[in-house]
């Protein structure tokens, strides 16, 4: 499934970036985002949301760049879910800086109508931490709870693997593109998640991991979760 407005929302994110509340403001202002995108500079200034720098970025980026990303998703069999789609999780619309676009591999569970718990923690987890992350992932999934985590080493991977062992639904929110081979040793886990849940990211499929993207994706993990279980964490952890 590729959203009918994917071209426009992808183009907007390429220009305005990610983790910005301007996405929320545009969503609230326009019933159909095509009106904004096709309105040109006059409309972009009239809406009152964008700075001169934002407008210059919109003018500099061609919509064909969004077309390339859409074609790539079609080739890879990924879904593109946008903020104005009916299947977009309502819980994500209610946060600061909602992601305009979700790239999805697998089937996004019904997060809005099912209990979901985030399980997070350090990449440098102790044996005790990884054991408990796995145990909680397994036990919660056995109770029909959707688990949500970030696919990183340590706590994240242990919780995902626990859910998979219980044949439960788990959602992995990545801080890179879903086609990027992040942590090759866990590719088997990511492949399994696409069969029993979903890999999701706000970044285009081949986007490499950059440090600031991981704290930013934490807002998505938190929003998708009715509660967050922190297994083990350092004082300065994101």
Where are these regions (language model features)?
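Glycine-biased, small-residue-rich flexible motifs in mid-sequence functional cores and linkers
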Residues: 1-5, 74, 80-238
């Amino acid at each position: 499934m590729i959203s009918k407005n994917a071209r426009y929302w992808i183009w907007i994110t390429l220009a305005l970036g990610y983790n910005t509340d301007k996405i929320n403001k545009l969503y609230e202002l326009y019933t159909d985002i095509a009106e904004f995108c096709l309105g040109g500079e006059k409309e972009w200034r009239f809406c009152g949301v964008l700075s001169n720098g934002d407008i210059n970025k919109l003018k500099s980026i061609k919509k064909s760049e969004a077309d390339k990303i859409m074609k790539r998703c079609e080739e890879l069999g990924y879904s593109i879910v946008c903020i104005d789609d009916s299947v977009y999780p309502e819980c994500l619309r209610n946060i600061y800086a909602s992601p305009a676009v979700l790239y999805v591999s697998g089937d996004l569970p019904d997060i809005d109508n099912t209990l979901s718990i985030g399980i997070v923690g350090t990449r440098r987890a102790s044996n005790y931490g990884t054991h408990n992350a796995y145990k909680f992932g397994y036990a919660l999934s056995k109770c029909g709870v959707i688990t949500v985590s970030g696919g990183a080493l340590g706590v994240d991977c242990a919780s995902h693997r626990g859910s998979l062992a219980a044949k439960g639904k788990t959602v992995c929110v990545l801080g890179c593109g879903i086609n990027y081979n992040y942590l090759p040793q866990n590719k088997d886990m990511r492949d399994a998640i696409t069969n029993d849940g979903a890999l999701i990211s706000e970044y285009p499929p081949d986007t490499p991991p950059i440090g600031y993207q991981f704290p930013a994706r934490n807002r998505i993990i938190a929003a998708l979760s009715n509660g967050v279980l922190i297994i083990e964490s350092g004082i300065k952890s994101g």
